[in-house]
């Protein structure tokens, strides 16, 4: 529930996490959303001739994030403490008044699992695979997704070539424009929040 739901239902004892997000996190997998085509229902985008399957990473991002609101000037830092005792600290931002903050994460193991599931699904369904992030802005976070997909693709490239299907990476804003212009018929792999939207 959100704050409004808490007011509507006073029997709620706390703002529980999303049940769907909790289940997806436990499964640590990929959600594939493939449309069901019905002749009498036409797509809103007239040039879509084939279905577009959304492959959504089912772990992390804002769904496992923490956030807070602060009321005064100050600075926010992010610190990682390794089991070895090593610490890494980054300045998030200095602010001159009230601010809202959010810290998100993802695990490399989960990103790899997501990439493999996407490549295998593309092979199983014989469809091209598109993947999009915003690594020009989130250079480390989204850059890790891009890097992992590139590394994992090496294991699937020969099979993709054999089937005549392709793997394509682009920035998410470019991907949206391309999707609208496309005829469909591919899998679009998205990070957790992007796939939700």
Feature roles, as predicted:
Residues 1-87, 193-197:
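N-terminal glycine-rich phosphate/adenylate-binding segment common to multiple enzyme folds
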Residues 1-3, 156-197:
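Glycine-rich phosphate-binding loop
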Residues 14-21, 49, 106-113, 140-148, ...:
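Conserved active-site and cofactor/substrate-binding residues in soluble primary-metabolism enzymes
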Residues 21, 60, 79, 84, ...:
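Structured catalytic/translocation cores of nucleotide/phosphate-coupled proteins
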Residues 51, 126-130, 186-188:
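Beta-sheet entry/capping signal
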Residues 78-170:
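Glycine-rich phosphate/diphosphate-binding loop of Rossmann-like nucleotide-binding domains
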């Amino acid at each position: 529930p959100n704050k409004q739901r808490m007011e509507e239902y006073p029997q709620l004892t706390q703002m529980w996490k999303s049940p769907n997000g909790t289940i997806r996190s436990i499964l640590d997998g990929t959600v594939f959303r493939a449309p069901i085509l019905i002749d009498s229902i036409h797509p809103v985008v007239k040039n879509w001739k084939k279905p577009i399957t959304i492959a959504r990473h089912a772990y992390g991002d804002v769904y496992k994030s923490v956030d807070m609101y602060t009321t005064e000037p100050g600075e926010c830092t992010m610190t990682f403490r390794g089991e070895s005792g090593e610490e890494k600290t980054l300045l998030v931002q200095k602010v001159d008044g009230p601010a809202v903050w959010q810290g998100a994460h993802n695990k490399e193991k989960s990103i790899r699992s997501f990439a493999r599931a996407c490549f295998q699904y593309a092979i199983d369904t014989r469809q091209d695979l598109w993947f999009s992030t915003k690594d020009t802005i989130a250079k480390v976070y989204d850059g890790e997704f891009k890097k992992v997909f590139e590394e994992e693709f090496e294991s699937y490239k020969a099979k993709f070539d054999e089937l005549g299907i392709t793997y394509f990476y682009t920035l998410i804003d470019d991907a949206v424009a391309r999707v609208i212009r496309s005829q469909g018929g591919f899998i679009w792999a998205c990070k957790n929040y992007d796939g939700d939207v």
